[in-house]
UniProtKB/Swiss-Prot annotation:
The lineage of its organism: Bacteria, Thermotogati, Thermotogota, Thermotogae, Thermotogales. Keywords: Carbohydrate metabolism, Cellulose degradation, Glycosidase, Hydrolase, Polysaccharide degradation. Broad substrate specificity glycosidase. Releases glucose from soluble glucooligomers, with a preference for longer oligomers; acts more readily on cellotetraose than on cellobiose. Displays similar activities towards the disaccharides lactose and cellobiose. Is also able to hydrolyze various aryl-beta-glycosides in vitro. InterPro entries: Glyco_hydro_1, Glyco_hydro_1_AS, Glyco_hydro_1_beta-glucosidase, Glyco_hydro_1_N_CS, Glycoside_hydrolase_SF. This is 1,4-beta-D-glucan glucohydrolase. It holds the Pfam family Glyco_hydro_1. The gene is gghA. Its EC number is 3.2.1.74, 3.2.1.21. Optimum temperature is 95 degrees Celsius. Is highly thermostable, retaining 85% activity after incubation for 9 hours at 90 degrees Celsius and 88% activity after 1 hour at 95 degrees Celsius. Activated by glucose up to 200 mM when p-nitrophenyl-beta-glucoside is used as the substrate. This activation by end product concentrations may be due to a transglycosylation activity of the enzyme. It comes from Thermotoga neapolitana (strain ATCC 49049 / DSM 4359 / NBRC 107923 / NS-E). Optimum pH is 6.5. One of its GO terms (biological process) is cellulose catabolic process.
């Protein structure tokens, strides 16, 4: 039996644009994901978040499912344009009402809310002013954060400033695969810097407004292994770790400087006097959230812009084509403790997409997802034994949902959503996870 510590928080996670639908209802403004998904060619099959899981209308049923599974915590995000349709200025009371109902219902059921302030749905009106590339966004984000802290901070004590800022900056502004769909390396690295400035200002406002809460930030992580013991391959893996994983942001937050290999590559793309902001960026945070899905083998490649390329391995993969490397979650957890020693750590997302089908009996037998989750939770347990101050684990995701540029083609839920009828079916993995929570650990 692999028992977890007393009070360990087992949770499920979602994000606003991925599940809510009704993006313009009740006075909400447009987000960049609304405009991006409505532009032909950006999202597979022309899918949009117009309906998604219709959580905007079915939130009560969805919270009942969380309760049925027995999750102790629910991580969800707030849609910025629901609260501030123009991004700043006038507050939309109906947006506040929607999230107030969710928060109050969770608390009635003894489910701890974890709120993500920004999970990628920037108000479109702010994108028209340059979005994350505009230095002023740090103040816009602080203003938005203040509205949330003042309205919800009396009841919500766990806050996340940003979800996966690397994805916001790089996938949205360098690869152009996510909103706002830009491909400009200067804009991308100015965005990295402005995300850090915005995060720091939000933390500062939090300290003034929410006296007894905790605030942190969430990063995407892959486990990068070198293809050989050659020095240049090891360096390639180190670069990818610094650039793709938590160090890109935690090094500034804890040490006031970007990681060495990132600076070597990107110094010319950062704002000219970026150092002047570093003191302000060094705000103490209460926890670090880590998302983990996959591992990658990398090698030195003189022909690639960053001198790195991926080496495909003969490993099992998920429906996303991501290699399944459970021990990677252990090494990421160990790494963050050794490199930055945060007070508390959470796994804020871990999960997998598979091609789920509903059986004739109306069940979803997703043994592959159970195997994936079990293997990763075992490694998480191992990290706790080795002294990582891990306080909770969140499965991505509660529901099948809008998987960004992949649209509805990829299912990550432990609950199946039939998008034609909006019927929810708890998958075998949902029942399995419910048992893990009940036992506070793995029995087999």
């Amino acid at each position: 039996m692999k028992k977890f510590p007393e009070g360990f928080l087992w949770g499920v996670a979602t994000a606003s644009y991925q599940i809510e639908g009704s993006p313009l209802a009740d006075g909400a403004g447009m987000s960049i994901w609304h405009t991006f998904s409505h532009t032909p060619g950006n999202v597979k099959n022309g899918d949009t978040g117009d309906v998604a899981c219709d959580h905007y209308n079915r939130w009560k049923e969805d919270i009942e499912i969380i309760e049925k599974i027995g999750a102790k915590a629910y991580r969800f995000s707030i849609s910025w344009p629901r609260i501030l349709p123009e991004g700043t200025g006038k507050v939309n009371q109906k947006g506040l009402d929607f999230y107030n109902r969710i928060i109050d219902t969770l608390l009635e059921k003894n489910i701890t809310p974890f709120i993500t302030i920004y999970h990628w749905d920037l108000p479109f009106s702010l994108q028209l002013k340059g979005g994350w590339a505009n230095r002023d966004i740090a103040d816009w984000f602080a203003e938005y954060s203040r509205v949330l802290f003042e309205n919800f901070g009396d009841r919500v004590k766990h806050w996340i400033t940003l979800n996966e800022p690397w994805v916001v900056a790089i996938v949205g502004h360098l690869y152009g695969v996510h909103a706002p769909g830009m491909k400009d390396i200067y804009v991308a690295f100015h965005t990295v810097h402005n995300l850090l400035r915005a995060h720091a200002k939000s933390v500062k406002v939090f300290r003034e407004t929410v006296k007894d809460g905790k605030i942190g930030i969430v990063f995407n992580n892959g486990y990068f292994e070198p293809a050989s013991e050659r020095e240049e391959d090891i360096r390639a893996a180190r670069f990818m770790h610094q650039f793709n994983n938590y160090p890109l942001f935690l090094n500034p937050i804890y040490r006031g400087e970007y990681p060495d290999l990132v600076l070597e590559f990107a110094r010319e793309y950062l704002p000219r006097n970026y150092e002047d902001d570093m003191e302000e960026i060094k705000q103490e945070i209460d926890f670090v959230g880590l998302n983990y899905y996959s591992g990658h083998m990398v090698k030195y490649d003189p022909n690639s812009p960053a001198r790195v390329s991926f080496v495909e391995r003969n490993l099992p993969k998920t429906a996303m084509g991501w290699e399944i490397v459970p021990e990677g979650i252990y090494w990421i957890l160990k790494g963050v403790k050794e490199e930055y020693n945060p007070q508390e750590v959470y796994i804020t997302e871990n999960g997998a997409a598979f091609d789920d089908v509903v059986s004739e009996g109306g069940k979803v037998h997703d043994q592959n997802r159970i195997d994936y989750l079990r293997a990763h939770i075992e490694q998480v347990w191992r990290a706790i034994q080795d002294g990582v101050p891990l306080k909770g684990y969140f499965v991505w995701s509660l529901l099948d949902n809008f998987e960004w540029a992949e649209g509805y083609s990829k299912r990550f839920g432990i609950v199946y959503v039939d998008y034609n009828t909006q019927k929810r079916i708890i998958k075998d993995s949902g029942y399995w996870y419910s048992n893990v929570i009940k036992n506070n650990g793995l029995t087999d």
